[in-house]
Structures are given as structure tokens and as C-alpha cells.
Amino acid sequence: MGRAKKVVLAYSGGVDTSVCIPYLKHEWGVEEVITLAADLGQGDELEPIRKKALDAGAAQSLIADGTESFIADYAFPAIQANALYENRYPLSTALARPLIAKLLVEAAEIHGADAVAHGCTGKGNDQVRFDVSITALNPDIKVLAPAREWGMSREETIAYGEKYGVQSPVKKSSPYSIDRNLLGRSVEAGPLEDPWVEPLEEVYDLTKAIADTPDQPEYVDIDFAQGLPTQLNGQALSPVALVEQLNQIVGNHGVGRIDMVENRLVGIKSREIYEAPALLVLIQAHRELESLALTADVTHYKRGIEETYSQLVYNGLWFSPLKDALDAFIQQTQKQVTGTVRVKLFKGAATVVGRQSPHSLYTPDLATYGAEDAFDHKAAEGFIYVWGLPTRVWSQQQR
């Protein structure tokens, strides 16, 4: 008896997911494999991917357009949370996984499948993100992960696929593992596995080399409404269009590159290259707007929430009670986060040079050192005495 009768497989067109099709059928006794490729704005032509799945033995090959939901329902809430894993990575790849899991479960329920499958190995984060998200959405559905169990090397995997007509797309001149969506790219493997080796320029695609960027700065005005990006340079745009345009503008100035060694959930360190031009600038601008609109205590407390939020998303817990609770807190904080932020882009740097908000708590006549100063300086002495009283008492006790 096979492990499942009908399976919906998350499909990318790569070696592992292509080999999963015959492997599920011939090794695990699956009667019918339906593939699902998610369009998340990665820019690939998906029709060849559909054909490749059918040629590899899939009974059906589905394509789900999730781009709008990806930006509006996943990326924009992460911007409100200023989500940066380990204070650097804006989760451009991690944010896609819960949506793909959701699309898989929906397809399985529509087509009457008793299992879903993915091509993740046992070494990365994505296996956790998929398995946990799928289980959270439908605890009764089976999750199959052939690449986690088959024990084949890369060469053996390719050879197995060729036996069933699966052609390898890997070129010897491109040793990298690349994942891409509308938010950005992640690149790993090959020469990048040595953290001392500087990435070649060929690694990057969305951002220009500094030598090729314009010799004049460019200014971008980004409007937010309750923490959500709404306009670019005074033009109202849909979430997808805003990210698309901002990616082009920001990447043209060489902004948006990350080279980091991160701590994976499975306990190993991994050297990753990320490009996320628009997402990084949107988080930077959003955080600056919060500095105007939020009180000091909310701002400081939210920083801890942001770190927990980022870890949850990175660790595959998008669909979890704690994530829901954090969402409620974050949404409460965003009610007054409305305004405009001006960002200067020049030679690989994005610098916030202006911010304004109708809900700004910045009071010029209290902040100024000029003649308009309305701050009561005499009140400072009593405040300092009370504020420092515990320290004074402690110091006296030590004598």
C-alpha cells in the first residue's frame, strides 16, 4: 500500500521537485501526483514549468497566482512589524512559505488529495515552514517530503530523474542555489559556502554594482496610511505595483544587498546572500515614521515584539496563536502611523532625510533651542532629583 493515494506537490521546476514526481509514484506507490507552482511575482514564465511537470508524470499541473496576496497579506504586515531576522534579513523568502502552504492545502481540499508534498531536504528551514504551516491549516492531511528521506546525492538525484525523463536544468557554470519572488532573491551554495570569499558580481541581479550606479542622488517619497505603504512620489499604487516600482528605483542605486551568516532553525549556520531593495527601504522608512507617531514606551516595547515576530516567521510559525496575538498588538500600534517619509538613494546607501505626519508627536517649540523654546527648564531639577533618587539611596547605602 502506498503512502498516499493522491498528492499535491509544491513544484518549482527544479531538480528536486521534478524528481519527486516519479519518486512518489514509483517508490512510494502514489497513484496520482498533482503539481502546484505558485506565482509570487518571481518573473519566470510558468507555462514551461507546467509542461515540465506533465512530462515528468504529473496527472495535473496547476499554477496559482498568489502575488497580490503575497504582498498585501504577508509582506505588508511584516513591514508594519519592522520584521528583520537577526536585525538584518527582511524575511523575503520566509514570508512566501506560509502562503505556498496555504495554496497547497486549498488545492488538496479542492482535488480530494489525502496528502501534500514538497521537495525540501532535511537541512534547511523550508521543510519546517512547510510542514508546520500545513499542519496548522489542516492537521488531518499527510505531509510527504521525499527529498528528506531518499538519501541520494545531487548526482544520484539527477541520474534518477533522467531515468524517468526528467532533464536537469543545472548548469555547471552556475553553482548557486537561487530562490526568487517579487520581494527579492536569496542565493547560497557554491563558492558562497566559504564565508571569507567575496561574492562575484554575477551573484546579484536586482541591484547594480556601486560602480554602475548613477552619480547623482535620487529622492523617493513614500506615503503610509496606518503603517501600510500607499503612495510612491505622490502616486497612489497597488501594493504589487508599489513594490515593483520601488524595486527598480532602489536597485538602480545599488541598495538592497545583504551578505550574512545566519542561524538556521535546524542548528547550523549558513552564509546567505539576499537582495530585497524595496522591502528593506520600506521597513527603514516605516520605522522612521513610527519615531514621529508612537510614544516612547510603545516604541521601545514594540522593538521586542518585532524581534519575536521575526523569529516566529523565520521559524515557520506564521499560523500560530502567538503570531495572532502579536498581530493584534502591532495593528493597535499602527493606527496613527500615517505620513510621508523621504529617502535619499545614492551609491549603495538609503538615507532617510525627511519625515512628516499629521499625528506627529514631535513638537518644535519644545524641541528647539531657539527663542521659541517653550520647555520649562526649571522643572528639570525636580524631575532629575526624583528620577535619580533610587540611585542616590543605593549609593548612600554602599558607604
From Swiss-Prot:
Q: Which GO terms describe its cellular component?
A: cytoplasm
> According to the lineage, what is the superkingdom?
Bacteria
Task: Write out the catalysed reaction.
Answer: L-citrulline + L-aspartate + ATP = 2-(N(omega)-L-arginino)succinate + AMP + diphosphate + H(+)
List where in the cell it is found: Cytoplasm
- Keyword Plastid in the entry? The reply is no
Q: Does the keyword Ligase apply?
A: yes
Q: Where on this chain does ATP bind?
A: A10, Y11, S12, G13, G14, V15, D16, T17, S18, A38, G119
The main location class comes to cytoplasm
Q: Which residues bind L-aspartate?
A: T121, N125, D126
Q: Which residues bind L-citrulline?
A: Y89, N125, R129, S177, S186, E262, Y274
Instruction: Spell out the disulfide connections.
Output: none
Name a biological process GO annotation: L-arginine biosynthetic process
For this UniProt entry, the molecular function terms from Gene Ontology, in alphabetical order, are: argininosuccinate synthase activity; ATP binding
PANTHER family membership: ARGININOSUCCINATE SYNTHASE
NCBIfam families registered for this protein in UniProt: argG, PRK00509.1
Note the subunit structure: Homotetramer.
Name of the protein described by the UniProt record: Argininosuccinate synthase
Q: Which organism is it from?
A: Acaryochloris marina (strain MBIC 11017)
